Amino acid sequence: KKMKTVYVYLQDGFADWEAGYAVAELHSGRFFQPAAARLQVKTCALSREPITTMGGLRLLPDLTVDEICLGEAAMLILPGGDGWLSLQHEMILEKAAAFLAAETPVAAICAATVALGRVGLLNHHRHTSVDLEFLRMVGGEAYSGSALYEQQPAVMDGNLITAAGTAPLEFACRIFERLDVFSPATLEAWYLLHKEKRAEYYDALVKSMA
């Protein structure tokens, strides 16, 4: 059985840390529950040219957006970055729409949520974003989902996960939950360890893996 792929979209200046927790655990699989299938993480961009993150790291995309294979996909992750507001990302937004239509999860954080709002992809799911007023302003007529907006760090509704840029931990948790890779006990211990930074949660994490 072929390993499913989690695609991560890269663009110059993207916010390194926003998908950091999620991809580290998805790639390593170190806390996966026994029944969870291993996943591969692949990066995609508009071209195969190197991408420089907000942190100055140079990354070489694995493939271009048009090479994404929906049939092999487990999820599409869209990290934030200022480029979402200025550059054109129609191709990846079309892919996001195709993923949702195929009932394959899409996870967007920070400015990526605003980009989804601009193309009407937040109108039928409960969601969060940077700020509702900002989303309304930038989304314009394409955004009619304000009744479904929730003031939460991260929101999962069906196959759509959205998060504020300040919530990479909660974003990761919703991703692990949707992909069903952690046991409930592991998920809780993992989150509390990173959130509260107390030794008891490390012990709980180890115990959850026993």
Enumerate the predicted regions with their spans.
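Active-site-adjacent pocket-lining segments in enzyme domains
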Residues: 4-15, 21, 28-47, 57, ...
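A short, charged, and often flexible helix/loop element on the N-terminal side
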Residues: 54
